[in-house]
C-alpha cells in the first residue's frame, strides 16, 4: 500500500475526482481545504498574506495503482501556471479498520 498526497488548486478538485472515479477499483480519497505557500510567493508590493488556498487530496492505494493515479493527478491538476501543486507518494506499512477492528491487507 502507498499513500498518495497531492496539493492542488481548488478549482481542479472536481475534475480530478471525476477522473479518479472512472478507475475500476479506485479505493476513494479524502480532500480538505488548506492554506499554504511554496515557491510561488506573493509579490511583496501586495498586502502581505503569503498563504494561498489549496486542496490537499489524500488516498491509500494498492502498489499496482500508484503510477496510474499519479499520472491522472499530474494530468488533471495541470494548468501550466505557477502553483499547480505537488504530489507525494509514501509507503504505508500497516492499516486498520476501526469498525471491524482488524488489520487490512
Task: Provide a role label for each language-model segment.
Residues 1-105:
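Positively charged, small/polar-rich N-terminal and surface patches that mediate targeting and assembly
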